[in-house]
């Protein structure tokens, strides 16, 4: 017995009593390689000698962390909203007008006030107008739009709505392999079933409807398939799906009675000649009422990617189409539990969907910065694929869009065996060794899912051009040494 009379005290919450679903969650983008990179950065600051002077994080799609400059107009308006006294200063008039409009829609005229749970009404109206412009006039109803703290928040919310059942009645959700680990992590946390369909690497990561049919048939043997998720442009694979592919997916969703989730956060990031972004909503409505009146769709967008790269503001939205009115009430209830999305994120989203117009003073600077950001990304996408494809043992598909490449590695058998001895996936072994020897931080392909017997890494194209050249050269040199060491 202890002095307080409580005897042996065992924690209420420990690894045996915690939610078992949380233990099943994995998120490779910030996994062991990244955690080791953080340790190495601390060691470098402490003066520990390394064969390099800095860690270059090419693991995550965080444009500003990689040195991309913010869009001037966006930051001016946000500054005015955060500190309205600046409205008396010498900011451009259109920036002041935009800030006043946003502040008038905020409680107490402040970004510090809660908003409506689905987001500030005038911003939802602006999002609807943006979608209409993007989709050639197809109507968008602000009541179908829910603002969110980044697209990830909205995606998880939608998965919560979809998840139900036990045993063979558990909800199954179709996700691509390779996939963005948000999806597998959320499904694990919600105790839903992941139904994997494979993209075709030999055809530039294209999507084959026959593979979808195979996957859903296999899924029905142990769960209840209810949804399919598509990332377009692709993460981690950098492909842009054709219009025909999108039509095929919509028909498949209708035939199999599946809810369709379209992750379109990279919609401005299209680089390859002959490629074009087509929104699922636009294609759905152009296919006619046979599909547009019945297929249930949620599409997602974000302030974090494209030319903006404003990850930290956590701005995003989802638009729902053909959702049961009673389910919409439940969705509204669910988002209200979190009170509201980030209000500064909502303000930034408003600027993304309602940027400066040609007759406004900030327009020329905005267009110049937007065009420059996208052009630089396009050049880096081409350069990355070109350089990696000169390395024997690395094969890289064209980076058609998004911010990543997902090259295939040919690894010596000796390296694969060495990885097994360390109880690591071979590409984890490769990426960890790359980090320790060069300071380059990548994400192993095994964290995204891949066909058995294949190995990859995901690398962002976001580092500044000169730094990206260094990254690519270091990878080239390392891969040669690695292959020689384990041959």
Can you describe what each PLM-predicted range is?
Residues 1-118, 122-487:
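PLP-dependent class I/II
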């Amino acid at each position: 017995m202890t002095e307080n009379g409580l005897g042996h005290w065992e924690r209420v919450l420990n690894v045996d009593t915690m939610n078992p679903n949380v233990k099943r969650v994995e998120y490779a983008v910030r996994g062991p390689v990244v955690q080791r990179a953080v340790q190495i950065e601390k060691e470098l600051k402490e003066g520990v000698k390394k064969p390099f002077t800095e860690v270059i994080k090419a693991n995550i799609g965080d444009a500003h962390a990689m040195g991309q400059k913010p869009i001037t107009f966006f930051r001016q308006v946000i500054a005015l909203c955060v500190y309205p006294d600046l409205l008396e200063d010498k900011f451009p008039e259109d920036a002041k007008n935009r800030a006043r409009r946003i502040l008038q829609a905020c409680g107490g005229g402040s970004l510090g006030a809660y908003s409506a749970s689905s987001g500030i009404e005038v911003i939802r109206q602006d999002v609807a107008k943006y979608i209409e412009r993007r989709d050639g006039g197809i109507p968008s109803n602000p009541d179908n739009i829910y603002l969110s703290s980044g697209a990830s928040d909205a995606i998880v919310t939608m998965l919560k709505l979809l998840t139900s059942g036990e045993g063979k009645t558990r909800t199954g959700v179709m996700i691509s392999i390779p996939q963005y680990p948000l999806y597998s992590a959320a499904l694990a946390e919600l105790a839903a079933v992941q139904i994997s369909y494979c993209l075709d690497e030999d055809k530039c990561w294209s999507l084959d409807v026959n593979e979808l049919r195979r996957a859903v048939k296999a899924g029905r043997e142990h769960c209840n398939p209810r949804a399919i998720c598509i990332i377009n442009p692709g993460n981690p694979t950098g492909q842009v799906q054709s219009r025909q592919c999108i039509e095929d997916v919509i028909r498949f969703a209708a035939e199999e009675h599946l809810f369709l989730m379209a992750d379109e956060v990279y919609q401005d990031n299209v680089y390859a000649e002959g490629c074009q972004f087509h929104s699922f909503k636009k294609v759905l409505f152009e296919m006619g009422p046979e599909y547009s009146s019945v297929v249930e769709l949620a599409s997602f967008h974000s302030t974090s990617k494209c030319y903006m790269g404003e990850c930290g503001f956590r701005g995003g939205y989802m638009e729902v189409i053909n959702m049961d009115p009673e389910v919409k009430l439940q969705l509204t209830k669910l988002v209200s539990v979190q009170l509201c999305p980030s209000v500064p994120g909502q303000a930034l989203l408003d600027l993304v969907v309602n940027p400066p117009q040609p007759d406004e003073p900030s327009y020329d600077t905005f267009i110049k910065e937007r065009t420059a950001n996208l052009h630089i990304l396009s050049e880096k996408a081409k350069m990355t694929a070109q350089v990696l494809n000169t390395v024997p043992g690395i094969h890289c598909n064209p980076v058609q869009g998004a911010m990543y490449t997902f090259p295939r590695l040919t690894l010596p058998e000796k390296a694969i065996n060495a990885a097994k001895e360390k109880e690591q996936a071979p590409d984890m072994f490769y990426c960890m060794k790359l980090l320790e020897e060069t300071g380059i931080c990548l994400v192993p392909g095994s964290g995204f899912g891949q066909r058995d017997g294949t190995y990859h890494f995901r690398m962002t194209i976001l580092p500044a051009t000169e730094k990206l050249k260094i990254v690519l050269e270091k990878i080239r040199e390392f891969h040669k040494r690695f292959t020689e060491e384990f041959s």
